[in-house]
Amino acid sequence: MPDFMTNLIEKTIVINALATDVWKALTQPFLMKQWMGEEEMNLHIQTSWTVNSPITISGFHHLPFVNKGTILEFDEEKVLSYSHNSSLSRLADESENYSVIKFNLSPAETQTAVTLTITNFPTEVIYKHLEFYWQSTIVLLKKFVENSKLI
């Protein structure tokens, strides 16, 4: 098994906001679109947030894409996780081709620590892409929650 498959991406950031507000930004599609990508990406997010139900995040970034997966955990204001496979990877729709994205929230008074953990990388390219994307996107989440008048 190549090394990248056993790699783990883990990032923790402290957001100056209540867990309630962070949770809204992570789970309300209208708010998710505000920090997950630029407006021209025209993101569309569909899910019921029920465990074992589908999630799709589609849009346009140089090419049309559809990221799909399944909700794995949904413990309100605590844990959210889902599987992830992008159409851009051109990998078969098989379980071994899905990464797992997980958010753990740890509230402390008026702040919330968010730990993002990503596991299971079917290819090195996917590992590098997710590392690159989430390096900046987790910071965008923080800025959005701390500065948004929408929450």
Name each region found by the language model.
Residues T6-T12, A19, P54, V66, ...:
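Intrinsic-disorder/low-complexity, polar/charged segments enriched in Ser/Thr/Lys/Arg/Asp/Glu/Gln
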